[in-house]
Amino acid sequence: STDTMPAANTNAEFTLMCFGERLDFSVYDQSCFTILYFGTSFSQAALFNTAMELLTEIQQITAGMHLLLNASFSGKGLQYLVDTASRIFGNPIYVVDLQNKYLAISAGIVPDNDFFREESKSGYISKQGIASIRANHLDEMVRKYNHPYYYTSELVHTGMLVDAIHIQNIEVGHVMLLESEHPFEDYVPDFFH
């Protein structure tokens, strides 16, 4: 609460999250610590709950990154990496090369969709899928943003993140994370990239 603010000359580095009536914070301009002020609409419980949600999210990202890093250097190949990533995200992942051949399809989580079942059997993106990619300029959008592109497929009626795969700055394929089992959290696009 702003009722219990420390002295401005407190000689310690920390971040203080506070709520309550607004003060003249200019007296803290030269302080060693940082103040995050949330206004009067926040309560102590709301501030605590928000902080816990953010810390939990950070912990999940850190744990997921650790698992992905281990999978990357495990020597077990692309399929193992894709399966590990799929377990972390809780959604299916597909990797294709630039000739529309599936290089890896995550095991375990399979969307209940005839289109994906047929494509998985053939090992290639179907003509219908290629036509949709071209009509929606999906390849161009992925290259333009240099970041995962969110796309809702009219063929599977669900969203997906699509990102380019580069090896030594050369695009060699695309990776797709389907939003079929769990909705994407705000951090997913950055983590997926």
Task: Kindly give the residue locations of the regions a language model identified.
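Alpha-helical/coil-rich non-catalytic "connector" segments in signaling and regulatory proteins
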Residues: 1-193
